């Protein structure tokens, strides 16, 4: 029983302790709930009081005035709101408008604000309430002293009047103002915790930052002013430009002629290859034009609207670089379109020429070529490639009237100019042609077009060719045609022999023309032909018949033109060297009157290939696309070829001018070349001239062709009978050097005689034959001392 009593008494004790814990746990919750309810109740009351104050009307009945009880109330708070607003305004003046805010702050502090700080200090809420009361008293007194001291309800109200009156009577106006101001500042500090020293420090920082801020604002204002002025200037310029655009004449757009190429009479005849007409066996007939492919229909270039738009774009792009210019004309062509630009006074051509790449980038085209001078016009040309490029066929050019009207058998069909008109040239007037460009620029196709132009214009009786093809690919296809002097040359040593023969033939023709009394090959052929037609042929003055052998005098015959094609001039220069350059220079200097002409082609336009000696004697040049302005200047002595488009696009420098013409070369397919070659092979047998490629060449009058191509007597000095042979032998055996130039220099004789002396020593076994590098070994021992 004793054990059961404590158990019974312990249960009530445990229940009491648990109830206390529950009450303690519920107490903060209840306090928070009551605070929230109190704030919810106070908030509408403060809003009601604030609305009553702001809608106060002096006509409403109140504490200080009586009115009509049945009159409408203007105050939003009704009659009670009008009474409360009148009481507050009369008591506190303008500070009454802040009273709801102060009451709200007091409610917040009392209910929520300082519950966390009560554990640290019990004076916090009390000091804040004291500060708010002090703020109310000091603010009303300050307003009454400083603003208005008239009616009771003005400024600080009754409270302000009492405070200001009591202070003024004791301390005077100055003392009252100072006291009220100090009380106001202290009250604000107590109510809010604001530190006036912190306020002054912050104000000082603001004042110090005011200087840089003003500088920035001043700078921004200056920039804004400048921007505004520039904007106004641009607007003014736009207005002026708009007026100019409205007044300016439209761009002159000259469309290409409808029939760009007029067919010749020969083209009308050669519409197809004759099937039943016999082919001439002597090769005198020209190949029909039907062997060539007909041109295909081409797409049009830029429309007039596009040309007008491009003209405006060019003007705007130049204006971006501060260049005033106006597009006055547009001339569309098969490959490019030329825009004529009239620059403003004071604008240099070099300023526009230096912007070619920038203009090309702005117009989104591959390249732009600037033409500095257009003959007969005061404008600058700007050549822009077309979007769709027209393919030019050789058959168009050979069927044109320009090609057919040319009476020269050396007429070359080069292509079309920028307007689409055929461009033909006379090789006899050039009289030599240099063709240069990078690989893939259309150089070999252009050479084939030139060859076919000559083959369609002249028979093998009027024209003979010597073709040198170091690459063994381009010109070898013409092997076996009756126009060739010798087989197509692929060995460069034979090429040197062929050039030596041409030099000797040039000298022989000069002697014939001198004997006949004419100045060029055309006059010589005319005189010989007239004599043959008259039945009194002229005898060869250089042929000396041998009566012992029964030889009769040989009559003269007309001489054909000779055209020498060298497809890759650089390879031949590398293999043969200076010797070939001298032969080519000699032909270029003198061969025009003799009817011998050169067409040199190279894909390496460098100064070691196109030397000054060659450029001085070959003024007519064709430049295809090159990689740099330096290469263009090497070929044409001016830039421009670096801006070409490739695929036959060329700059043609005619003889006697310094301004190149832009020409778009004609395309010739391999099938067309093979058809023409097969037709020429069937028209006549090949008739090579003997000895053209031989190492030792003898002319018809018995003279031997020397190393320089000049004829030398076969029985002249230079062998063992030469009086200088022994002296030359002594020099060679003593110096142990078998050099032609050394013998020539020591004996002070000509090159040909020194060469014959060395050859005589080789025949006598004194020196060895020349090795692959041209050196000889002295085999004989030195003379005894």
Swiss-Prot record:
It is a multi-pass membrane protein. ATP binds at residues 440-445. It is found in: Cell inner membrane. Residues 200-785 are cytoplasmic. Gene3D superfamilies: 3.30.980.40, P-loop containing nucleotide triphosphate hydrolases, Winged helix-like DNA-binding domain superfamily/Winged helix DNA-binding domain. Residues 1-14 have a biased composition (Basic and acidic residues). The chain crosses the membrane at residues 37-57, 92-112, 123-143, 179-199. Residues 1-27 are annotated as: Disordered. Keywords: ATP-binding, Cell cycle, Cell division, Cell inner membrane, Cell membrane, Chromosome partition, DNA-binding, Membrane, Nucleotide-binding, Transmembrane, Transmembrane helix. GO terms for molecular function: ATP binding; ATP hydrolysis activity; DNA binding. Residues 420-633 form the FtsK domain. Pfam families: FtsK_4TM (PF13491), FtsK_alpha (PF17854), FtsK_gamma (PF09397), FtsK_SpoIIIE (PF01580). One of its GO terms (cellular component) is plasma membrane. The keyword Cell wall biogenesis/degradation does not apply. Its main location: membrane. GO terms for biological process: cell division; chromosome segregation. The keyword Cell membrane applies. Belongs to the FtsK/SpoIIIE/SftA family. Consists of an N-terminal domain, which is sufficient for the localization to the septal ring and is required for cell division, followed by a linker domain, and a C-terminal domain, which forms the translocation motor involved in chromosome segregation. The C-terminal domain can be further subdivided into alpha, beta and gamma subdomains. The alpha and beta subdomains multimerise to produce a hexameric ring, contain the nucleotide binding motif and form the DNA pump. Homohexamer. Forms a ring that surrounds DNA. This is DNA translocase FtsK.
């Amino acid at each position: 029983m004793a054990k059961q009593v404590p158990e019974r008494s312990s249960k009530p004790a445990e229940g009491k302790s648990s109830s206390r814990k529950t009450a303690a746990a519920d107490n903060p919750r209840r306090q928070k709930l009551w605070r929230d309810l109190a704030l919810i109740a106070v908030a509408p009351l403060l809003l009601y009081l604030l609305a009553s104050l702001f809608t106060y009307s002096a006509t409403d009945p109140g504490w200080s005035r009586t009115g009509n009880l049945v009159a409408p109330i203007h105050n939003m708070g009704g009659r009670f709101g009008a009474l409360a607003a009148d009481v507050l305004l009369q008591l506190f003046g303008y500070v009454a408008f802040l009273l709801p805010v102060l009451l709200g702050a007091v409610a917040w502090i009392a209910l929520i604000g300082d519950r966390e700080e009560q554990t640290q200090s019990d004076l916090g809420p009390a000091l804040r309430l004291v500060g708010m009361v002090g703020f109310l008293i000091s603010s009303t007194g300050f307003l009454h002293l400083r603003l208005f001291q008239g009616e009771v309800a003005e400024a600080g109200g009754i409270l302000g009047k009492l405070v200001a009156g009591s202070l003024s009577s004791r301390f005077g106006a100055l003392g009252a103002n100072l006291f009220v101001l100090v009380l106001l500042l202290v009250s604000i500090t107590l109510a809010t915790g604001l530190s006036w020293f912190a306020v002054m420090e912050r104000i000082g920082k603001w004042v110090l930052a005011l200087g840089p801020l003003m500088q920035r604002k001043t700078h921004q204002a200056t920039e804004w002013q400048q921007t505004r002025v520039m904007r106004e200037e641009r607007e003014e310029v736009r207005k002026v430009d708009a007026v100019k655009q409205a007044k300016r004449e439209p761009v002159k757009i000259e469309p290409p002629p409808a029939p760009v190429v007029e067919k010749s009479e020969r083209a009308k005849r050669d519409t197809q290859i004759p099937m039943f007409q016999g082919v001439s066996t002597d090769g005198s007939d020209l190949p029909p034009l039907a062997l060539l492919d007909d041109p295909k229909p081409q797409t049009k270039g830029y429309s007039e609207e596009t040309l007008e738009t491009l003209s405006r774009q060019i003007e705007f792009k130049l204006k971006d670089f501060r260049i005033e210019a106006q597009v006055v004309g547009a001339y569309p062509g098969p490959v490019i379109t030329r825009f004529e630009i009239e620059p403003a006074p004071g604008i240099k051509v070099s300023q526009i020429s230096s912007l070619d790449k920038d203009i090309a980038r702005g117009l989104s085209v591959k390249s732009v070529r600037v033409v500095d001078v257009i003959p007969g016009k005061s404008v600058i040309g700007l050549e822009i490639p077309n979007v769709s490029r027209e393919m030019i066929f050789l058959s168009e050019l050979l069927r044109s009237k320009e090609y057919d009207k040319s009476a020269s058998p050396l007429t070359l069909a080069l292509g079309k100019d920028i307007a689409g008109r055929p461009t033909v040239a006379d090789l006899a007037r050039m009289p030599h042609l240099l063709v240069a460009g990078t690989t893939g620029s259309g150089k070999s196709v252009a050479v084939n077009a030139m060859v076919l132009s000559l083959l369609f214009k002249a028979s093998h009786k009027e024209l003979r060719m010597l073709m040198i093809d170091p690459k063994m690919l381009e010109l070898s296809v013409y092997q076996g045609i009756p126009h060739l002097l010798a087989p197509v040359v692929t060995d460069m040593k034979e090429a040197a022999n062929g050039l030596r023969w041409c030099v000797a033939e040039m000298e022989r023709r000069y002697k014939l023309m001198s004997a006949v009394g004419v100045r060029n090959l055309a006059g010589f052929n005319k005189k010989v032909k007239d004599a043959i037609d008259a039945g009194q042929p002229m005898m060869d003055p250089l042929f000396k018949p041998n009566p012992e052998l029964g030889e009769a005098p040989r009559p003269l015959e007309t001489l054909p033109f000779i055209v020498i094609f060298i497809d890759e001039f650089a390879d031949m220069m590398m293999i043969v060297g200076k010797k070939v350059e001298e032969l080519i220079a000699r032909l270029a200097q003198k061969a025009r009157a003799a009817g011998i002409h050169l067409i040199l082609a190279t894909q390496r336009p460098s100064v070691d290939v196109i030397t000054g000696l060659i450029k001085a004697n070959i003024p007519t040049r064709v430049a295809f696309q090159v990689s740099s302005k330096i290469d263009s200047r090497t070929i044409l002595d001016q830039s421009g070829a670096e801006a070409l488009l490739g695929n036959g696009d060329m700059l043609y420098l005619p003889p006697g001018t310094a301004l190149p013409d832009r020409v778009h070369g004609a395309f010739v397919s391999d099938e067309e070349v093979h058809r023409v070659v097969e037709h020429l092979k069937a028209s006549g047998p090949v008739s090579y001239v003997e000895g053209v490629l031989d190492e030792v060449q003898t002319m018809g009058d018995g003279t031997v062709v020397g190393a320089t191509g000049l004829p030398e007597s076969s029985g002249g000095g230079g062998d063992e009978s030469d009086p200088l042979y022994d002296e030359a032998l002594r020099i060679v055996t003593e110096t142990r050097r078998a050099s032609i130039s050394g013998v020539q220099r020591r004996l002070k004789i000509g090159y040909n005689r020194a060469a014959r002396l060395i050859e005589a020593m080789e025949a006598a076994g004194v020196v060895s034959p020349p090795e692959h590098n041209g050196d000889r070994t002295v085999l004989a021992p030195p003379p005894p001392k």
